[in-house]
Structures are given as C-alpha cells and as structure tokens.
Amino acid sequence: MTKGTLEIHSENILPIIKKWLYSDRDIFVRELVSNACDAIQKFKILADQGQASPSLEDFKVSVSIDKEAKKIVFSDNGIGMDAEEVQKYIAQIAFSGAEDFVQKYQSKNEKDQFIGHFGLGFYSAYMVADKVEIQTRSYKENSKPAFWSCDGSTEYTLEEGTKETRGTEISLYINKESEEFLEPSRLKEILKRYCLIRYFKCLC
C-alpha cells in the first residue's frame, strides 16, 4: 500500500470549493458521468486503432445508490487506469485546477469564472462526500487493479485493488449535509436535467 499527499499547496482548497459552489452541489453528477463516458470513448478509439482488444460486452455507464452504506457509485467499463495512471491523473492533475482556482479567483465574487475556466471534474465529488474511493483496472494486458481512497484532506492511500474487469468504479460516501442525494427521486431529477437518466440504477 502506498500513502501519499496530493500535490497541491493550498490545504484549504476543498473548503473554498464547497463555499463557492454550495448552491451547485449537484454538478458532481454531471461531471462524474461525463468522465465515465469519456473513459468509454477513449477505449473505443484505442480499439478502432488496434491498440486495444475490441470489447466483447456492451459499453455501459451506471449511477447507483446504496442507501444503507450511504454511498453513490459511478461505474463504467471504459479505458480504466493502472496504479501509475491513478497517481498521475487523480493524485496530481485532478486537483491542479482547484489550486489554480484558489490562486486566481479566491478574492472574486463570480463563481461562474471558476466553472467556465476549469472543469470541476473529479474533485467536485467532495462537494457532497466525506470520502471517495476508486476501484479501477486498465484495459492494458496483465494490468493490475488499483484502489485509491481519500477523505478530502491532502492525504490519500493507493494500493492494489480487487476489480476483476476493465473500467472504473467511483464510490462517494455522502456526508450528512448532502443525504438528499441518496433519495432516488432527487438523483433521477438531476440526471433528467442533464439528459443522463438512462444511467440510473437504484440499489436502495
């Protein structure tokens, strides 16, 4: 198991994001589904170019609720990641936009400047979650699965995962203030607004 620190210099990044985007908390749904769709599209391109074995299964993205565990799970069978890629794209790059936000827009009043200038992406999950976990496995042959976990601080853990198939599963452990998103009707409303309702699955 590897323990590390997110490569950011402002430890107050997540509290600032939460403050600025509080009224837009549901944007995490759009961002994470979009990321999942992108992962599938990337795999399709690699397969078309002969750089990946064609998929023998239908491509799918799903959003599910587990009310008992108080979590929302976003899953896809796209390109996936290995441990090195998780380290690069999640522990480093995903939070760089947030740091830029702190440096450039902390004293400004228009949150739309942030939304328009930087993709909220992965770290928007911390608008509603106390902890985020990732189980992922790369499309690459003989690749080992990876498991990443972070509670919203600058510390995270990265170790070998348990995922047996290609793709990524992101679990958001919803905080007390955001339990409204554990209601199927609420999540359905958000997905409908972003024309993503076909991805919904309830494990209530």
Go through each PLM region and give its residues.
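Low-complexity basic/metal-binding stretches
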Residues: 194-204
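GHKL (Bergerat-fold) ATPase N-terminal catalytic module, capturing the glycine-rich phosphate-binding loop
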Residues: 1-176, 180-181, 189
